[in-house]
């Protein structure tokens, strides 16, 4: 059996993402602490290294103003250390729980798309919430309507199968990433 070059590259990328995702223990070993600012209409997480003023990572989310099944959207994301981004996404899912988290509705980087693909394809602990578009292509309900530009841009012709057309939350509730980081003394509220 021959594997095409594009399939092989995809498998390598997926494996790198799995290996690259930082654990809470690894973050603690690097001296990273997470500052959380949660408001009724937004949440921001800063990953800071002890002794440094500059954030090693920043992730912010907020409601969109559209129904979107009550999901919050990533509005800014930056990670300066490999593997930190996926850990911060997991933490944001816990911070905004029980609301689901979704990608930026307009623009998503290739790295972020891989994280969302991983949630869709490989995370049994994460529940997927399918979102409709603004014209009720999937359901007659208004509550799940959401702008789908990023899904339609990345997955032309199959936006409903796109990881970007969904929102994500912990299956059965719980906040395991938050709880582990807090247990390790790596959470600060500002």
Annotate each predicted stretch with a short phrase.
Residues 79-95:
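Conserved acetyl-CoA-binding loop-helix of GNAT-fold acetyltransferases
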């Amino acid at each position: 059996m021959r594997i095409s070059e594009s399939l092989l590259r995809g498998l390598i990328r997926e494996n790198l993402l799995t290996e690259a995702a930082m654990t809470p223990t690894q973050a603690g070993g690097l001296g990273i602490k997470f500052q959380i600012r949660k408001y009724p209409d937004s949440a921001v997480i800063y990953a800071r290294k002890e002794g440094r003023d500059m954030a090693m990572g920043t992730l912010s989310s907020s409601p969109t103003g559209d129904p979107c099944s009550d999901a919050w959207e990533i509005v800014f994301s930056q990670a300066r250390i490999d593997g930190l981004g996926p850990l911060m996404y997991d933490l944001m899912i816990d911070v905004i729980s029980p609301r689901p988290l979704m990608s930026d509705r307009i623009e998503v980087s290739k790295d972020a798309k891989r994280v969302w693909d991983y949630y869709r394809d490989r995370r049994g602990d994460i529940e997927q919430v399918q979102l409709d578009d603004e014209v009720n292509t999937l359901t007659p309900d208004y509550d799940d309507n959401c702008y789908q530009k990023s899904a339609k841009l990345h997955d032309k012709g199959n936006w409903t199968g796109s990881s970007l057309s969904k929102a994500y939350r912990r299956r059965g509730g719980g906040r395991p990433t938050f709880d582990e980081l807090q247990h390790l003394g790596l959470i600060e509220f500002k």
